[in-house]
């Protein structure tokens, strides 16, 4: 599936400009939770909304709650879990730059619904 077939939803726990940065660097569709007006929406509701979009939505988060929701409820949506702990925005971008091509390739397989990126 080409990168423009996915829509990356960027959780509030990530830098506010992450969606814009992903668009500029990878030509993907990306929207922040703020842009989607999810500032006070519970994670369970966000998950249900994303699930209605089939396998297109990729919730990008550092929040283990979405990982747990996927374990409990199933997929869709897809989850890109950034298990990085405390990390500077610059180092987070560097990490994503090295892994994002592989992320897109793995998510192209409909069976891959969860990818975790960790610091080495």
Per-region residue spans from a language model:
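Short beta-strand elements in bilobed, periplasmic/extracellular small-molecule ligand-binding domains
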Residues: 29-33
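Acidic, metal-binding active-site segment of PIN/NYN-like and related structure-specific nucleases
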Residues: 50-70
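Amphipathic coiled-coil/heptad-repeat helices and related helical stalk/stem segments
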Residues: 15, 42-43, 62
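Short beta->alpha junction loops
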Residues: 34-40
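Conserved strand-to-helix beginnings and helix N-cap segments that scaffold or border functional pockets
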Residues: 43-44, 93
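Acidic, PIN/NYN-like endoribonuclease modules and their adjacent C-terminal/linker elements
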Residues: 1-12, 16, 20-27, 38, ...
